[in-house]
């Protein structure tokens, strides 16, 4: 899928992440920036799991995988990559690398972390977290590389501002909930997934999480009693309307 869009007109990340501006940086126009105001006032992510939802969790578990701990969880990482292949390649028909029934790409490196919701070995949902400071050869992280024109499937104007490179911002990608999860359990799965996402991001020093999600995200977030702001235009990517959003996890409450 090709895009001929131009990223011209993007502004530095500090223009919309005022708390990430270098010490002593003078930006008098900051107070007039509506996006910055929205981000400053964005409530902390505090996933709320209603009792009715908790009752459907059964034996669900949530795990954060890394290259250094995945050996402790048997074939959970392999199962995650196989679940991603079923979702993104088999169902959505994305053109992605695959081998031995697993989907993977250049961002599945030791720099990333993988959030998995699972039950009795079955993968129910997953997210990949990558620091925006990541570098692996010519690649960094998905949104930044897309903005630089390195990813054919994502347009260069995916963000309203220049993609940030800061240890306090992590990117969420490869977000999915298995189609095998029945409707009455999906909110429980989503709740566990987001809860573990925010905990993991915070534990790694992040104050914000940025990512591209289906444009109906606002309805989904409201069901979880969460808040976020759009930081990019709505885009058609592989026949799905998507949009970049931003969470704050700096004040995450357990």
Identify what each model region corresponds to:
Residues 48-101, 113-124, 131:
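Short amphipathic alpha-helix that is part of the acyltransferase structural core
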Residues 100-106, 232-235:
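Short, solvent-exposed loop/turn elements at beta->coil junctions and helix N-caps
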Residues 106-116, 135-137:
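A short helix-loop-beta-strand connector motif used in the catalytic cores of GNAT acetyltransferases and
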Residues 2-5, 9-61:
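Short acidic N-proximal helix/loop "leader" segments that mark the beginning
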Residues 116, 123-128, 171, 209-212:
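A structural signal for short, well-ordered beta-strand segments and their strand-loop junctions
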